[in-house]
């Protein structure tokens, strides 16, 4: 990776297909503008979360073809593609096989059986799932209210709880959502290996590891960035990726004050983090560069390699700013963006805490063309 600008786009962001973006990048005016291109994951077959709920990693040929990817490579542009390590869609062939065959499915342990995981660390409820001990719950990091469970109905009528950190929707025995993978299953590691090989075959140079920090789990742990399990897991993924010529880019969505980015840098990884969007809004709206410059200075002095962006499908990250901006300034930033139409998304645990503001970057800047151009220039 280098320090030149990276284009971030969905396959249908400019025109209706990836071929339209390739045609744009071929224009004389665009030559040498971008050294790399992050193609977001609706490139694959997906069903939710703007591409981040992957059904399978085959190309969605309604939007992109291998010829499109080859054209981009011929322009000298490195491709960055996603691999979502923690979960797969409830519409994935593995999960559909589990729903269809139950205990007879070869993917019975591909996903995390909640009761098997918590056996010996909680009490069975009348609803058929184990309620973890309070000592364990106090340690856990939650992404939504309640326990992260999806009750899956097997063919014999039994309802079996499976770990479901993110979205879920249930209609009888039809499921939508993102089901957590059991990284202790050999089949999951076969899946990881095959997927990395497939991504490499598309010509990718960089693989962004989405949600990797949720994958290692253990009773009594936070189950987000577990130490040392997360770093051991990342090393195993590296050992699969390196022979394929793939550079890993772990995604970190955590408070600056936790210094996870420094841990990754110390272990030799670049990071995909979310500090820049809020810092630039703060700099522009408050007419000051202090906090933005302090962060940039740290990156340069400590030789930290990082990939940043401004807008994303989730909105403007805020939790990440803790330790970078004073708390009152973060709250003021939230109020400003909400006054411009944004909506606050909270995390759920023992108490609600802000996570991000759902808004486009243009809206967050008050729909000002000059501010948007300045943000992009920075």
Roles of regions detected by a PLM:
Residues 1-378:
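Active-site and adjacent substrate-binding regions of carbohydrate-active enzymes
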